[in-house]
Amino acid sequence: METFPILIRKDGMPIRYLVVDDSVFARKNVAKMVEAFGGEIVGEAGDGCTAITEYDRTTPDMVLMDITMPQMEGIEAAERIVRSHPTARIVMVSSVGYQENIVAALQKGARHFVQKPVKSEILYEVIKYVMGDDAAVATPTAQES
């Protein structure tokens, strides 16, 4: 896997993620990527209902969420999370790249969209963009060099 500069919050702590996808493989793949970026997985969910519960429980810095899932789809879950937490950062990660789905997700509060299969360099740049001024690239210490 390609290496990337570590992304951290402005307070020096790791960016905390909630990863939501009904595919365990997809969740693990995305989790592996964000951990390589220096992130911390604080929760996982396989459907929109569980995503809402996990968001309330973990208050992550960012949610990476699939669109098509059982019980409640990602767009509806994103809308409900943003309604309760207006500053929530949600990035939709889906193979369903129809323009109407992307537009609907953005209208309901998602901040960005990443097409599956996820490319780590694209996910990294999207995370940097969505975190904005609340994130920084960690400067290596002498021990890490």
Protein language model regions, located:
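Two-component/phosphorelay signaling modules centered on CheY-like receiver
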Residues: 24-43
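Acidic catalytic/metal-coordinating carboxylates
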Residues: 47-50, 73-76
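Active-site beta3 strand of CheY-like receiver
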Residues: 58-64
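Receiver (REC) domain active-site loop signature in two-component systems and cognate sites
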Residues: 69
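Short, conserved "switch-loop" micro-motifs in signal-transduction and mechanochemical regulators
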Residues: 96-97
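C-terminal output helix
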Residues: 100, 118-127
